Design a protein with these regions (language model features):
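Internal acidic/polar
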Residues: 2-6, 91-120
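Amphipathic, Lys/Arg- and hydrophobic-enriched alpha-helical face
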Residues: 24-42, 58, 127, 179
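Amphipathic alpha-helical segment used for protein-protein interaction
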Residues: 15-18, 106-140, 144-154, 175
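Arg/Lys-rich amphipathic alpha helix in sigma70-family domain 2
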Residues: 38, 57-64, 75-96, 116, ...
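DNA-recognition helix of helix-turn-helix
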Residues: 78, 82, 134, 143, ...
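Structural recognition of an alpha-helix C-terminal capping motif at a helix-to-coil junction
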Residues: 46-53, 67-79
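Short, charged helix-capping/linker segments at alpha-helix termini
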Residues: 14-22, 33-50
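Core residues of bacterial helix-turn-helix
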Residues: 25, 48, 55, 141-144, ...
Length: 187
């Protein structure tokens, strides 16, 4: 059976093809949940479900190809997360929970290798040390697998700014890993 592209899957899903929508979900949801784990921790699955509900509700209005679809879904997820943070800021809450981070393979991105060489708990700790804008950009690039232009559209920054944030964030992660490696070799 020939594999159909996500672009054609988007058009078929918009026409009501449930199997096409399932294909889109299977292809994109794991990356979406990984990104949301960085932003929302234990609430990532719930936030992903809310995102997909919004996607279903707005699918008929989406215009674009498969790459645009992924960016659109991540934008919806980010907006859902920010809306939740705004609501939470209006009421007292307690932070906590055991946050897990599942990492995607870095592919050809050498900077992302730093993120992938470490375990879940260490990755979360190190990404948590980054400035919030660096952490989000690093998460979208390495965990979401998105291109610079897509990340720029999602976070509302210029592509050059996204490149700088990504580079600085990944450099800080690599430096932290190197410091850890030196410390471990001295012990």
């Amino acid at each position: 059976m020939a594999h159909r592209s996500s672009g054609s899957a988007v058009a078929r899903a918009q026409a009501g093809d449930e199997e096409a929508f399932r294909t889109l979900w299977r292809d994109l949801n794991p990356r979406l949940v990984r990104y949301l784990r960085v932003l929302a921790g234990d609430d990532a699955e719930d936030l992903a479900a809310q995102t997909w509900e919004a996607v279903i509700g707005g699918l008929d209005r989406f215009q674009g190809d498969d790459d645009g679809f992924a960016g659109w879904v991540f934008t919806i997820a980010r907006h859902r997360h920010l809306d939740g943070r705004r609501r939470a800021a209006r009421r007292p809450h307690e932070l906590g929970g055991d946050y897990r981070l599942e990492l995607l393979a870095a592919g050809d991105d050498p900077g992302a290798e730093a993120v992938n060489r470490i375990g879940t708990e260490d990755a979360l700790r190190l990404i948590g040390m980054l400035a919030p804008d660096q952490a989000e950009v690093v998460a979208l690039r390495t965990l979401g697998g998105l291109e610079v232009a897509e990340v720029a559209a999602i976070v509302g920054k210029r592509p050059g700014t996204v490149r700088v944030l990504s580079h600085r964030g990944l450099r800080r992660l690599a430096e932290a890993l190197e410091a850890t490696r030196l410390f471990d070799s001295e012990v």
